[in-house]
Amino acid sequence: MKRRLFLVMLIGLFPCIVFAGHLYAAERTYNVLFIQSYNHRTPWNDRLTEGVRDGLSRGGIKAKVTTGYLDADYWTFASECVIMRRICERARQKNTDIIITSSDEAFYTLMHCGDSLPYKLPVVISGIKY
C-alpha cells in the first residue's frame, strides 16, 4: 500500500518538477563562451557566432555569447596555451556556464593548455577535421 502511494505521488509530482525546471531554464540567462580557432577577421567567424546565437534563441535559451579568438594560424602551440589560459580566466570571471569550440585547434588547445576550466564545465565541440 505504501509503495503504491509512493508511486502515485512520484508519477503525479514528476510533471511538476519537470515543468518547474523548464520555467527556471527559460528565465535564466546563460553565459556561453564560444572559442574560435582563428582571428576575428576570418570571413566565416561572424556567421558561426550568429549561428550559435540564433540556435540558442530558437531553442528558447537566453544566452550571452562571448567569443574568444585563438588565432592559431599565427601563434605557436606554447603561445596558444598562454592565450587559452587567459581566455579561461576571463570566462571564470564572467561565470561562464558552457564552452563551445569551433575547429580542432580551439578544442585541442583548450584541453591541453593546463587550465582546469574545461574539466569543470560542459564543452561542446564543432568543426573537427581530424
Region roles according to the model:
Residues 2-10, 18-130:
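Short hydrophobic alpha-helices and adjacent helix-cap/hinge residues
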